[in-house]
C-alpha cells in the first residue's frame, strides 16, 4: 500500500531536496500517522537537522500537517490510520527574516 508525501515551505531541504516521496506503508511498521512522522525523522539527510522537523516525538510547532487536504488536528493527529492512496503534506511556516 502506497502513500504520497509532499514537503513544502523549505522542508525539502531536510530530505535531500525531494519535494515529493512515494512510500509503502509496509516500510513504516504501522499505519499510524505517528509512524510516518518517526520514519520521516529517521530519513532526514543530516541527523543534526532532525530538530527542525520533530520535537518531543511529534512534528515541530510551525509545521502544518494535511492528510488528503484536511488538517491532521481534525483527524486524531498521530493516531490517524493511513490508508492506500492517502496524501500527506508537511508545510513549514518557520523561516528566518
Curated annotation (Swiss-Prot):
Subcellular location: Cytoplasm
Placement of covalent cross-link Glycyl lysine isopeptide (Gly-Lys) (interchain with K-? in acceptor proteins): 97
Entry keyword annotation includes Transferase: no
GO BP terms: protein urmylation; tRNA wobble position uridine thiolation
Main subcellular localisation: cytoplasm
Similarity comment: family membership: Belongs to the URM1 family.
InterPro entries with a match to the protein in the record: Beta-grasp_dom_sf (IPR012675), Mopterin_synth/thiamin_S_b (IPR016155), Urm1 (IPR015221)
Modified residues (1-thioglycine): 97
Any Pfam family hit: Urm1
Role played: Acts as a sulfur carrier required for 2-thiolation of mcm(5)S(2)U at tRNA wobble positions of cytosolic tRNA(Lys), tRNA(Glu) and tRNA(Gln). Serves as sulfur donor in tRNA 2-thiolation reaction by being thiocarboxylated (-COSH) at its C-terminus by the MOCS3 homolog UBA4. The sulfur is then transferred to tRNA to form 2-thiolation of mcm(5)S(2)U. Prior mcm(5) tRNA modification by the elongator complex is required for 2-thiolation. Also acts as a ubiquitin-like protein (UBL) that is covalently conjugated via an isopeptide bond to lysine residues of target proteins such as AHP1.
GO cellular component labels: cytosol; nucleus
Recorded coiled-coil stretches: none
Organism: Schizosaccharomyces pombe (strain 972 / ATCC 24843)
Pathway assigned in UniProt: tRNA modification; 5-methoxycarbonylmethyl-2-thiouridine-tRNA biosynthesis
Name of the molecule in the record: Ubiquitin-related modifier 1
PTM notes: C-terminal thiocarboxylation occurs in 2 steps, it is first acyl-adenylated (-COAMP) via the hesA/moeB/thiF part of UBA4, then thiocarboxylated (-COSH) via the rhodanese domain of UBA4.
Entry keyword set: Cytoplasm, Isopeptide bond, tRNA processing, Ubl conjugation pathway
UniProt GO MF annotations: protein tag activity
